[in-house]
Amino acid sequence: GSIDTNTPLLERLRFIAIASSNLDEFFMIRVAGLRHQVVNGIVKYDAAHMDAKAQLKAIDESVQRLVCMQRTYLNNVLTELENYGFFFTNPDLLDVKSKAWLRHYFEEHIYPVVTPLAVDSGHPFPFLTNHTINAIVRIFQIQPDGTKDYKIAILPIPSVLDRIIEIPSRGNKEHRFVYLEDVITYSANQFFQGYGIEDYMVFRITRDADLEIDEEEATDLLSEVEASLRRRRRGDAVRLEVCGEVKDNLLDFVLTSVELEPKDVYRIDGHLDCRMYFNFCNYPGLDQLRYVPFEPKLP
């Protein structure tokens, strides 16, 4: 998989993306089901004679270790990609020309599809769809007496855009990429004219997607499945992933808003959701970093 250095580099990256996707499914179904047992006081024991609470604790310990390992392998792969001229960087580290290009890209493609959401007494915390990435931002205005008046807003990272943005090359062999959420947080002041940015935090919520269908009670199985699918889209939160420099006040605010506890938080060293690398693995001209496509032949 991602560890075996004999495996082509982009196949190792693809494996990391697959593992990330599988872990999402595991939380949406298996962890959600165990949480459901705990909440409803259902006592069931598995083959190791562990109840749901004990299983959840063991899962948490394993997943925390797994996520750390995954990030180590990912960083190794991204570092190796630099040997082939592929660099993942931050918007603030770009040269003047590249920053100008990115500013134009932001104004043309990103700004029009991002809708900031206010969170205050008149605007409750919005329902954030499963696996979307969002930034919570604390903004302020200076009052006449010199104090800061704070507000909270959510910047949804649009899923209609590719998470990985390539910066046009400067005629050399280097390919440079930035992440969509970094561009949005880097330009966050564009969304809040007249406000200062105090701090922000990028996060991702995983929701319960376990289908609960009571076949005994359901007179019409089709409508029961449809109702279950509707509930699934608005399932309870089961995991919160955060990355970067985590601000405790913002983390507590999100936890309270989505009804999770500190034990449900996974702090990610790097960018959230490795599934974004699936597309990158098909980058043209890098066939030497992929397996040779299998061509079926007639016997």
Predicted regions and their residues:
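N-terminal localization/anchoring segments of enzymes in phospholipid and broader phosphate metabolism
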Residues: 1-299
